[in-house]
Amino acid sequence: MKYLNPNHAMLVTVPRIAAVFFIALQLLGMKVYPGGTMYDASTQGYSFSKNFFSDMGAYAARNGEPNYFSMILFAMSLTIVGITFISYYLLLPKLLGNNRINYILTWVGTLFAIGGSVCMIGTGFTPSDVVFAPHVFFANNIFHCFLVTAFLLSLIHISGAHETSENLV
């Protein structure tokens, strides 16, 4: 068996596995969601076009039935992705920080990515029907944090000064 570089595992293999788990858990969560939408509590199951993503993480479905299984799957999937993102972004300064400016930009981007990842996990553990304000805070800040991360990492990419070593990946 070929030696697996640990950086390759954390930057390529683990994120792929996490993505598969995320999709599988979300699809299963949609399948077991009891039903109801914001405008029609009588609908059966989860509607991709009429339910909010966060409905799967609610304590009770929009039709009033308990939503425990879907809620657990929702929290698990967001936790898996959040932990994977934290691990991934902690390796980026080593990969992209080939000069002082890139190193600083990558670390600042990483800090925002960690913030976004924590917010992702927080979204999974704050059901919107039980603790609405914290849920919205976490959900909104996923996007705010990752926007800053994407901007900073784009600057590194656009500058073209991001040569990486073959040994890292």
Regions found by a protein language model. Name each.
Residues 11-38:
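N-terminal signal-anchor transmembrane alpha helix
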Residues 15-18, 22, 74-77, 81, ...:
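Hydrophobic alpha-helical transmembrane segments of polytopic
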Residues 42-66:
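Extracytosolic (periplasmic/ER-lumenal) interhelical loops and adjacent juxtamembrane/interface segments
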Residues 60-94:
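Individual transmembrane alpha-helix segments
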Residues 84-112:
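Cytoplasmic juxtamembrane regions at transmembrane-helix boundaries
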Residues 112-153:
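Membrane-proximal helix-loop-helix units in multi-pass membrane proteins
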Residues 156-164:
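Conserved small/polar residues in nucleotide/adenosyl-binding loops
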